[in-house]
Amino acid sequence: MSGNMTFSERHLQEARQILDAIDIAPIDRMVSILAELRDAGGRLFFLGVGGSAGNCGHAVNDFRKIVGIEAYAPTDNVSELTARTNDEGWETVFVEWLKTSRLKPTDAVFIFSVGGGDMKKNVSANLVRALEYAKKVGAKVLGVVGRDGGYTARVGDAVAIVPTVNPETVTPHSEAFQAVIWHLLVSHPRLKIQQTKWESTH
């Protein structure tokens, strides 16, 4: 990579490299799983922390409104999230939320995460606990994650890994491509049932 590049040029070049390198196969598997989930009346639960939590709330809106899937994110309910964190601890906050939501085999858990969770390193242990429960219940596990994908990639049914092209920009690219991929999904002809406003004004 040229040392004469500006930061903006380098960042956008990295984004292009990621686009060229990303594996499409797990994304197409997500489409099939989500179509089957909707047909079966299943629900979709988005889990993430930090910037990924913000993406979860946005994705919930899109999957409900555009795709017609009943979707939720525990991080959208600040009162319950903080009560569980205060009373029970951060590590179990998502798994207990899924238990209260009566997670079923017809449902799916969708992870947005930079690292995918790693119990040994004590990174996003709350995601790992939630995924352990999801697998026990028999729910599908989807994800868009960075780095090596962590625990999410190891147990997931369809997990897109955002390739690392620069170790110093893993987080911004991982979170940006979460949005790229979920917008691809809600725009996919197998999933999209509601036209978005600006595309309907031609």
Stretch-by-stretch model annotation:
Residues G117-L127:
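Glycine/threonine-rich flexible loop motifs
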Residues K136, V145-W198, H202:
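Short alpha-helices
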Residues I22-A40:
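A short, well-structured juxtamembrane/interface segment
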